[in-house]
Structures are given as structure tokens and as C-alpha cells.
Amino acid sequence: MQNQDFIHTLNPEQQKAVLHTEGPLLLLAGAGTGKTKVLTSRIANIIHQNLASPQNILAVTFTNKAAKEMAERVNSLINCYGLNIGTFHSMAARILRDQIEHLNLGLNNRFTIISHDDQLKLVKDIVKLKDIDTKKYAPKLIHIIISRWKDQGLLPTKLSVSDTNLPLQRVAKLVYEEYQKNLLISNVLDFGDLLLYNNELFIKNSEILRYYQEKYRYILIDEYQDTNVVQYLWARMLASLYKNICCVGDDDQSIYGWRGAEVGNILRFEKDFAGATIIKLEQNYRSTLPILAAASNVINNNKNRHGKTLWTDRENGEKIKIISCWSDKEEARYIAGEIDKLVRENRYNAGNIAILVRAGFQTRSFEEAFINSAMPYKIIGGLRFYERMEIRDVLAYIRISLNQNDNLALERIINVPKRAIGAASLNKIRGYALERNISNFAAIKEMLEIGEIKAKSYETLKDLVTKIDNWYERFSIDAPINVVKAILDDSGYLEMLQEEKTEEAFGRIENINEMLRAIAEFNDVHDFIEHSSLVMENEVLETNYGGSVTIMTLHAAKGLEFDVVFLPGWEEGVFPSQRSLDEEGEKGLEEERRIAYVGITRAKKDLYITHAESRKIFYEIVRSYPSRFITEIPDEITIRTSSMKKYNSFYKF
């Protein structure tokens, strides 16, 4: 596209944003309002007007995919070479390669960046070296605390008394100090160090900061609402000379507080950059009017936000369907049936339909419902339910308790949780079993009797054998759910996850609880094992359905769009998450509401919101209540009904 033809394809507000080239600009871009088009057009305009060469423009994104897309779109508008487009980490790494010696830390520009797994291994090694009790102070949690401190721009020497109030924090500081020493000795950095040391470099060396301020005269930052403290400080320092910074974001879509994102960064932009211009992109090109009205009415209940209202010039579209279901199982059946109907009536292809859940554990009931209806589906951002590590672990415990000859099951669980059974001991057990043509479990029993097991492993293996024998007996006389709960307790598996106290571990516990709900539906444990195997093996061809239905969490769906969206589980305690409310109070509620807003605005044409009147928790049917977010959606844009069509007065609050 030559000259400035691209300007004429923009709406008035988009044009204002593109033509604003001097001074700080906050571009509040609502969902589906064309922010990427504006960003790329703005870069093209700066180059076209000869305000800066491509080498003097810095555009920062959160993902390599977004950076690549931005570069391609800029090049489609104007031919340019040398534009600096990349992620926060890639741009920070580039600066450190050139300037690392000025930090005087002993690092050189051949440093390597270590993976998450290597970071965690180093933390574990230090914890072991320092003889720290891992039951009280889980290495994974220590690593998370260290990463969070780095996201806040805090080196060990900068930690305040308030940062180390708790015993866990004091232990984490001790590990952090040793962790950083090890990194420096090895000439390696982790991802958190890249921006952390960039900022240290800028603070300690004003000449280097000035060099990059001159180099990057125009700065553009995408998804500004997702920046953490260290990213925010980095951008602010770089922009403090010329102040030609354009931050694009939507405070209503700030949903990553749990991983360090600070919505306050976008809310205080005007204070950080005096005289800043704020432009709101509110014309939505994605969704129908009822969908936008629902999103606006929900998010308007948040107090800490920049006010904006999405609108569209598209036709009104379908009303939002809000469906009450008798139970969570009925909810899954209803959604699977409705999707089957939409596809068979050729209204939509399966590939244009999504189910967006608040938490990963919710996917199980939908997976099973789709298998029953032979509808192809895919899980995005995670494994299918029965393929998840913790589910496979528990299944292995069940299998070895039913069939003591199951070598694969035994090998999976023998050191989960850790039982100090090393590779040498395992090889010895395998060799003993092969020589005598018996199972590994039988070999362990014999070796315990004749003293062939080393003292270090003897007690743990003897304890495990006793427990497996006990579970084997219990399965013949007790309900499966009771035995599996006993396995989780007796084995220490549940305790292992609880002691981890991480977001990941909490998600695994939620998945196990969901698995227990599934087990509770079976009187015979063999039927459950067979059922789970069939679910894992199921594969439905997509040919006749126009692709697969997408199942994913609301967090994973950010930035995506679908013709039809189903939002299940809109019940108090599920969504908003009770955990968020308990831990974060009003702040947590506002983030939950932003997650709801993101979910609603993924829909282009049709939106279904469902909730269950009851959920089965083991043997108990627990009453559920509609989410407060449902009450925030006006009646006039909805059709509210029951999946059983027995009544429609449930919503007369």
C-alpha cells in the first residue's frame, strides 16, 4: 500500500491514534476494535512522515507470534528495514549482549539463558545443600517467590523487611542469594534476569540509558495491561527522554494478576506521563450488539477502570441464551446436544464453536459428553483430562492395586511421592523379576523377605507393598470412591501436592477432585478403568463436522474469537472463583469480572451462558446458585430458560 492509503481504511478514532505522533499516548483498545491494525498503521505513518527511521522505532509485544505478525503487517503497509520488533525478553537480551560487561558482575556477552526446568533444578540443589526441609518449604514455591521478586525488580539486596516477613520468604531470600551467585559463576541468566539487569544497567549508567533513549525515539508497547513491575520500569526509563511512547491495552482485559501483571500500570499512565493523550477505541468489529451490551453491563460493575463502552454498527443479532441446568452432568449433555444440533443444521461448523471454562477440571464432563455424541473436540492449552500427569498417576495407583502384576503402573508410582528408590535399586528389582519370570511387585516381595533390598529403600518399599496389599483387599469389599480416597491419603500423593502450595499444584488437586466425582458414578472400579481407557483412546474424525469444537480455559482464549461461544459453570464459587474471592477480596472479584468480560467478547454471533443448579461432590448433591455476573446482564438482551424446559422462573431474583 503506497503513500498513506492505509489511513483512509481507519475509523475516526483509529485515525487520531495513528496521526498522534508526538508525546505520550495511551490507546485504550476494547476487544475486537482493531488495535493491531492501528499499531502497525502508526508505525508505518511515523516512517512515512520521516519522523524516525525504522531503526529508531521500538515495538514490544508479549509473544514471538505477535511480534512476527506485527512485522509482517507493517511491511505490507510500507517497505522498511531494521525495525525493532520483539518481546520484552528478546529486546532486553539484545541490550545485555551489547552492554553486560558494564554491570561488573563477571558476566560476559556469551551468557546463556537457562530453561524453567534448569532453574527449578538449581533451586532444588540449593535447598538440598542448605538442608532445608522440603516438606515445609517446597522448592517449586521458593522458585515462584524468586521469580515474583524478579518481576518486581527486586534483587536479594533490595528486599525489604516487609518482603521477608514470613518464614517461607526468609528461606526464599537465602536460596535467592545462593541462586544468583550460581548463575553468575556459570555465566547464565534466567528470563527474569534479562529485564532485571537491564534496569540495573540503566540506573547505574546514565550514558548507556541515554544511548538507548536516543536509539529508540518512538516506543510502542502492546498489551500494556499485562505488564509487570519490571517491564513497566524498563519502558518508563526508555521513554523518559523523548516521551514518544504509545501504550496499547485494555484494562478490562487484565486477567493475569496471578502471574505478576499489574493493572495499575495502565490505570496510572497519565500520572507517569504528564500531558498524556488518551484515545479510546470503542467501535467493535467482531461481535453483535447483544454480546457487546452484555460485556459492557458486566464490566461496568468494576470500579477501578477507565470508562469505555463498546459499540457496533452491525445488525442486532441473536439474544444471549442463559440456560439453567439441573446438574453439571446435565449441563455438559445440554451443551453437547446443542452443538450437535447447530452443526447438523449447518448453522455453524464445529471448528467455529468454543467452550470456555473457568478452570481446567471442568473439561472432563464435556469430553465425555462429546464422546457419547461422537463430536470431534480438541483441548487447547492443555492435555485432555485423562492424559494429565496427576490423573495418570492416580490411575496407575488404582491399576497396581487391582492388578499387582502391572509393571508399568508400579514403575510410574514407585517414586511418586519420592521414596528414595534409586535407579540401581530399580534395575536390581527388574533383573530379579526377569530371571524368575515374575512381576516386579512379586520380585519386591521376595527380595524383602530374603534381605535383597538395601536398608535405605527397605522401609519405604515394605510400607508401599503393605499399602498396595491393603488397597487390593479393600477394592473387593468397599465402594471405589472410598478406596481411591484412601489411596490418595495413604500414599502421600495428595499431601505432596498440598505441600507444594503452587498454582499448578492447586490445579492438579482440582483435577483429582473432578476425577473423584467421576469415580463416584461407578459401583465397580473396573468399569471406571475401562471407561477412562475408552475416553483416552477416543478419536472422532473431523471431516463431517467442519473441524473440532475447541475446549479451553478463559485465560487461554484471550485474543481469540469464535462464531459461537458456550460459557459453562457460571455459578457462585465456580465463577467467580471462591479461591479468588477468599484470597484477594474486592481485587479478586474485579479480576474475575474482567475474565467474564474476556469470555463474553470472544463470541462473534452466538453466546450461551449456562449454570447448574447442583453439583455432585462425591456422594453429596450440593446446591449451586447462579453467578452474580448473570444478574448483571440485562433481561431485554437475553433468553433465559431451563435445559429441561420445565420452568423459566428461576431467574426471578
UniProtKB/Swiss-Prot annotation:
Keywords: ATP-binding, DNA damage, DNA repair, DNA replication, DNA-binding, Helicase, Hydrolase, Isomerase, Nucleotide-binding. One of its GO terms (molecular function) is ATP binding. SUPFAM superfamilies: P-loop containing nucleoside triphosphate hydrolases (SSF52540). InterPro entries: ATP-dep_DNA_helicase_PcrA, DExx_box_DNA_helicase_dom_sf, DNA_helicase_UvrD-like_C, DNA_helicase_UvrD/REP, P-loop_NTPase, UvrD-like_ATP-bd. One of its GO terms (biological process) is recombinational repair. The keyword DNA-binding applies. One of its GO terms (cellular component) is DNA helicase complex. It holds the Pfam family UvrD_C. Residues 289-559 form the UvrD-like helicase C-terminal domain. The keyword NAD does not apply. CDD domains: DEXQc_UvrD (cd17932), SF1_C_UvrD (cd18807). Its EC number is 5.6.2.4. It catalyses: Couples ATP hydrolysis with the unwinding of duplex DNA by translocating in the 3'-5' direction; ATP + H2O = ADP + phosphate + H(+). ATP binds at G32, T33, G34, K35, T36, K37, R286. It comes from the Bacteria. Residues 8-288 form the UvrD-like helicase ATP-binding domain. Has both ATPase and helicase activities. Unwinds DNA duplexes with 3' to 5' polarity with respect to the bound strand and initiates unwinding most effectively when a single-stranded region is present. Involved in the post-incision events of nucleotide excision repair and methyl-directed mismatch repair. NCBIfam families: pcrA. Belongs to the helicase family. UvrD subfamily. This is Probable DNA helicase II homolog.
